[in-house]
A protein has these predicted regions:
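Helix-interface capping motifs at the ends of transmembrane segments in multi-pass membrane proteins
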Residues: 73-98, 261-299, 312-322, 498-501, ...
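Non-lumenal N-terminal regulatory segments of integral membrane proteins
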Residues: 1-140, 146-149, 154-162, 167-247, ...
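Acidic, divalent-metal-coordinating active-site segment for phosphoryl/phosphodiester hydrolysis
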Residues: 527-529, 535, 547-558, 595-603, ...
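Cytosolic catalytic regions of ATP/NTP-dependent phosphoryl-transfer enzymes
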Residues: 210-218, 333-511, 518, 531, ...
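Alpha-helical transmembrane segments of multi-pass membrane proteins
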Residues: 64-84, 100-110, 129-130, 260-278, ...
Length: 886
């Protein structure tokens, strides 16, 4: 069978009827039997995004990471020293076995969590389906893109994403944006096979009659036959041969920064602990194992799992709120925005545009204006927007009473069209009536219509467009705009040639016949939603292509500041510095092109803001791409949905507010884990360093450190489900390694102070009370003394680490002003009591622990309560100094 490139190259040189026959199809499309045969022969229309990981690879990646490698190295060293090099009868593989079991438990939890996350993401993705209009068995039908097969006939129009590599056999002013494949930013016109001027090209991408998967239809329409699907397409080939690089998000950058912070800290502390213990005790091998254990203790091994669980939980909650998170990280990015940019249509307004008035130039109702507007909207092949639909709907309604509006699609025949673009802000159709009179009918923004008109029509009389008439029209339209009505102008000219290739330059010397006034009222929820966003630290800015008067009227009704409004023309005259200042004070921007919208968003980002952009049209895709979070709706055009990070199933700002709050909850609970764990572990390591210098033995066995670390991490598994203070949700937050370092340096030494107090009490009071004597190096009772000491600090460390979670998880007074989730309470208590029970259970000899008496537990209660009180006091000083907590 020929390769895909050979088939594409052959298709542009082959008559259409021969290509149809080759793929066993016809102008009626494939039948179901042939669909299955072509699918078996040419494959499915899905691109392999790299080979899916096997279950074994997922298990491997869940278990093996830099931290577990260190653990396994410790296990290996312990195996060598305690088994292979041990004297006969003294072999003890306990430490190695415990470490391996702990690694497997940690990896198993992460593996299960990753599987749940993957499943949730897959289920959410299935909620958003891009479709294509396909002709099969002579009928047009909407099918998911992945159901297309080679030989299918597809209908394409403005706003569509090309669903496969296709060859055009019908086209009408069909322009495609294929910068993703070629790098060229300008739209390219594609022609039907029989109209292509030259097929002698160096690259298939230059072929005028070929369009490729993943490119976007900017304007016009076409009918095409699918030539290649899935991995066989140009896009599929690129996916298979290139490792695409996505620029890391701010979240990913800060996670990397935190990781390097921990690595640097570990590189400093581990050698110090190693030399301190080696010089004190003289056992360098044991000192090495202990130092490596310290390194493990300093790192939050469960961080990847906590992050995944938090993001997945947020995504699942948002799905219940009719918000689909396409990328897990987007939920956190959504919580970090402090500016939401959005078009007003369908967001502030009800998205149900009604044509209120078809008016002549003096503002009187005129069905002749509606007649011409209908011709323009009905016969255009581009994307019919809400106003086109409103025109068609009003015409169908009025045609029952007005003969002038009846049978227009039979009276008129379309000759040509000039599609809409965002520079001209208008579109034209050329039609011929049953008297063979050829006319151009143009509809567009009134200001643009006035620039191309030389005459006006009033009650059948055509007169020159004078300055007085122009001002009268503008005054009338201004009045309508102030009422919140959107206005389009309608013009025409007749007596044109049929056999002529019309161009944009022919939109001249037009006769302005009237205008159309549309009503798109604000949503009742718009004003409270904007206020709710503001209360959560998110300012709403309107970026619209509509004119300033309509925009002003709508924005005033929903409570937005319209005193300072910027227009697209103003922005073009501004330097970057001037725009940087303007975007801070201006709330409403009108008459913008897509490029101007993107420029505003980029400037806001340069100013240090987290920016979300919400849109649903072709012109919104560039803005969504440059924003920190691109937001769209399930009814948006394909390219908008493809570009978006977040898709709303309900186009309502109230839903977004919920998403932003949920994103901040995700951030809060991840931050809790990182700050708590890093500061707690730092305190433990500082305590170990002090103990290593002053104690004649290890304050805790390596296996104790590892068990302590894992049990603590398991208790933190509940943190993604913790409650978050309402005050914290009022403002956006960003990741800062500096903030984490500061928190660690402040809170870590506090735990060290109480650890050192514990050392003193254990060494001089509690352990001597139990053993009846003080520590004497080399004596028969020395081992018992060491085991009791290590047990005492082991239990105290667990209680201090788990109980302080409740102090650190909130800036408020815990349990009184801020209550943790019941699962957090349960997990911390289970962890603390589990470790406390170990000296009294079956693992006592394996872990080398020993029971402690009542004096120890009285001391433990006092030291833990004193520690919690001290943390609460220091917390108030910290918040007062730095104006933050988490």
């Amino acid at each position: 069978m020929k390769t895909t490139k050979e088939r594409l190259a052959a298709a542009i040189q082959t008559p259409l009827k021969d290509s149809l026959a080759f793929y066993h199809t016809s102008l009626k499309g494939l039948d179901q039997e042939q669909v299955e045969e072509n699918r078996d022969l040419y494959g499915e229309n899905t691109i392999t995004k790299g080979q899916e990981d096997s279950i074994f690879k997922k298990i491997y990646e869940s278990i093996i990471n830099p931290f577990t490698i260190i653990l396994l190295v410790i296990a290996f060293i312990s195996l060598v020293t305690n088994v292979w090099l041990a004297k006969p009868g003294q072999e003890d593989p306990t430490t190695s076995i415990i470490i391996v079991v702990l690694v497997l438990i940690s990896g198993g939890i992460r593996f299960v969590q990753e599987l749940r996350s993957d499943k949730a993401t897959t289920n959410l993705s299935k909620m958003i389906v891009n479709t294509a209009t396909v002709i099969r068995d002579g009928l047009e039908q909407e099918l998911p893109i992945d159901e297309l097969v080679v030989g299918d006939l597809v209908k394409l129009s403005a706003g569509d994403m090309i669903p496969a590599d296709v060859i055009l056999f019908e086209s009408r002013d069909f322009f495609v944006q294929q910068s993703g494949l070629t790098g060229e930013s300008d739209a390219v016109e594609k022609l039907a096979l029989n109209k292509a001027t030259s097929q002698n090209i160096e690259s298939l991408l230059e072929a005028e009659s070929l369009a490729f998967m993943g490119t976007n239809v900017i304007s016009g329409s076409a009918t095409a036959m699918v030539l290649a699907v899935g991995d066989d397409t140009m896009m599929g080939a690129i996916e298979q041969t290139l490792n695409t690089y996505d620029e890391p998000t701010s979240f990913e950058r800060e996670m990397n920064s935190i990781s390097w912070l921990l690595i640097r800290l570990m590189l400093v502390m581990v050698p110090i602990v190693f030399f301190a213990n080696g010089l004190t005790d003289g056992d360098w091998l044991e000192a090495g194992v202990f130092a490596l254990s310290v390194g493990v203790g300093l790192t939050p091994e469960m961080l990847p799992m906590i992050i995944t669980a938090s993001l997945a939980k947020g995504s699942i909650i948002m799905a219940k709120e009719k918000v689909v998170i396409k990328k897990l990280n987007a939920i956190q990015d959504l919580g970090a925005i402090d500016i939401l940019c959005t078009d007003k249509t369908g967001t502030l307004t009800q998205d149900e545009i009604v044509l209120e008035y078809p008016l002549d130039i003096h503002g009187d109702l005129d069905m002749a204006v509606l007649r011409r507007a209908y011709l323009n909207s009905h016969f255009q092949t581009g994307l019919k927007n809400l106003m086109d639909r409103a025109i068609i709907s009003r015409t169908e309604k009025e045609s029952k009473e007005h003969a002038i509006l009846q049978d227009l699609d039979k009276i008129f025949q379309k000759i040509d069209e000039l599609p809409f673009d965002f520079e001209r802000r208008r579109m034209s159709v050329i039609v011929k009536d049953d008297s063979n009179v050829v006319s151009m009918v143009t509809k567009g923004a009134l200001e643009e219509m006035l620039t191309i008109s030389t005459h006006v029509e009033y009650r059948g009389e055509i007169i020159p467009l004078t300055e007085d008439i122009r001002q009268e029209v503008l005054a009338e339209v201004g009045q309508l705009n102030r009422q919140g009505l959107r206005v389009l102008g309608v013009g025409y000219k007749s007596g044109l040639r049929e056999d002529y290739a019309y161009a944009v330059t022919d939109e001249s010397d037009m006769i302005l016949t009237g205008y159309l006034a549309f009503l798109d009222p604000p949503k009742p929820s718009a004003a409270p939603a904007i206020q709710a966003l503001l209360e959560h630290g998110v300012k709403t800015k309107i970026l619209t292509g509509d004119n300033e008067k309509v925009t002003q009227a709508i924005c005033e009704k929903v409570g937005l500041d319209v005193e300072h409004m910027l227009l697209g023309a103003d922005i073009d005259q501004m330097t970057d510095q001037e725009l940087a200042e303007a975007v801070e004070s201006v709330t409403v921007f009108a008459k913008l092109s897509p490029d101007q919208k993107a420029r505003i968003i980029l400037q806001l980002k340069k100013n240090g803001h987290g920016v979300g952009y919400m849109g649903d049209g072709i012109n919104d895709a560039p803005s969504m791409k440059v924003a920190d979070v691109g937001i769209s709706v399930d009814t948006a055009v394909d390219i908008a949905k493809e570009t978006a990070d977040v898709i709303l199933l309900d186009k309502d700002l109230m839903v977004l507010e919920t998403g932003i709050v949920e994103g901040r909850k995700v951030y809060a609970n991840m931050t809790k884990y990182i700050k708590m764990t890093v500061s707690s572990n730092f305190g433990n390591i500082f305590s170990l360093l002090v103990a290593s210098i002053f104690l004649p033995f290890l304050p805790m066995a390596p296996v104790h450190l590892i068990v302590l670390n894992l049990v603590y991490d398991l208790s933190c598994v509940a943190l993604p489900f913790d409650n978050v203070d309402q005050d914290f949700l009022k403002q956006p937050h960003t990741w800062e390694a500096k903030s984490i370092t500061r928190f660690m340096v402040w809170m870590g030494p506090i735990s060290s102070v109480f650890d050192i107090l514990t050392f003193i009490f254990l060494y001089f009071i509690i352990v001597p009370l139990v053993t009846g004597h003080h520590y004497v190096h080399g004596s028969e009772s020395a081992l018992q003394f060491i085991i009791l000491f290590q047990t005492g600090w082991f239990i105290e460390s667990m209680w201090s680490q788990t109980m302080v979670i409740h102090m650190l998880r909130t800036a408020k007074v815990p349990f009184v002003q801020s209550r943790p989730a019941w699962l957090v309470i349960l997990m911390t208590l289970v962890a603390a009591f589990f470790v406390t029970s170990l000296p009294y259970g079956p693992l006592v000899n394996i872990l080398r622990l020993a029971p402690l008496g009542l004096p120890y537990f009285l001391f433990l209660i006092c030291i833990i309560f004193l520690y919690m009180f001290s943390v609460t006091v220091i917390k108030k000083f910290y918040i007062k100094k730095y104006k933050e907590w988490l």
